Design a protein with these regions (language model features):
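Catalytic core of soluble alpha/beta enzymes
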Residues: 154-262
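N-terminal capping/lid subdomain adjacent to the active-site entrance of alpha/beta enzymes
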Residues: 1-177, 182-184, 191, 195-198
Length: 262
């Protein structure tokens, strides 16, 4: 018989980190813990307050329900938590963890065997120019070859100057640059800003305008000189038919898939 419980854990940022939605000081997460016949499994339900579609008053109640009904099995529980994507990914992790020889090794791969690293981007948080410039230097010194810069909260001209300073020293062959606007641009100004950004050999921009403006986003994706990646646009669209229709309307160059959010 499987037993389940959960724990809340608050992660504290070493440095308050800025996005166009505000300053982040803490990150709330929930751990789902399963046990059976002396074995255990752990899954993380990574809720993002203010962003996740399942940031709702009954979130903890749903976790309690999941724990009380864990014997229903993974497939039924996933169907019953379709509006709680962060709980779904926690469930998947927890069951895989329970079934694995090592609870913290869900899949055997070159990464888990310490044979190969996974390339990730170095995230540059928003802040004043000096703060962002210090982060850029630090990430490059750490060996990152792809930087993703949050934009949209400070003066656009300053952000452009930062991108220009990187490109002055590092070519596109040396450093890949991506930007994430988190929906900060107004539809009326977005295309012009994308044209300016495209001068700096960027890989792509995430979510230039707020989600929900399908026609405006579709027009941007059609006319943009800079590839667009949908991010927040995918949050809360649970029905497969609706997801397909949205992508057919917008026709983005890329999509960002975050298991805790979609």
């Amino acid at each position: 018989m499987i037993k389940a419980t959960y724990y809340i854990y608050i992660l504290k940022f070493k440095t308050p980190s800025g996005t166009s939605r505000g300053i982040l000081k803490t990150k709330e997460t929930w751990f789902l813990y399963l046990s059976k016949e002396g074995e255990f499994g752990v899954g993380e339900c990574g809720l993002f307050r203010g962003l996740s579609i399942d940031d709702r008053p009954d979130y903890e109640d749903k976790l309690k329900w999941v724990c009380n009904n864990i014997e229903l099995g993974l497939d039924i529980l996933l169907a019953k938590t379709i509006h709680f994507p962060s709980i779904q990914i926690g469930l998947e992790q927890a069951f895989l963890s329970l079934q694995s020889p090592s609870p913290f090794k869900l899949f055997v791969s070159n990464f888990t065997e310490s044979n190969k690293a996974i390339d990730i981007n170095g995230l540059i948080w928003m802040g004043d120019r000096e703060f962002m410039n210090d982060q850029i230097k630090e990430k490059i010194a750490q060996g990152f070859r792809c930087l993703k810069m949050k934009i949209g909260a400070i003066d656009f001209a300053t952000e452009i100057q930062l991108l220009a300073s990187i490109r002055k020293e590092f070519s596109v062959k040396d450093i890949e640059l991506r930007v994430d606007a988190n929906g900060a641009f107004k539809p009326s100004e977005a295309l012009e800003k994308l044209k300016i950004l495209s001068n700096y050999d960027l890989h792509s921009i995430e979510q230039p305008i707020r989600q929900g403006h399908y026609q405006e986003m579709a027009l941007l994706c059609e006319e943009t000189p800079l590839p667009i990646a949908l991010d927040e646009e995918l949050i809360g669209v649970f029905d497969v038919t609706k997801r397909t229709k949205m992508l057919q309307i917008i026709k983005p160059q890329y999509i960002i898939l975050k298991p805790s959010l979609v």
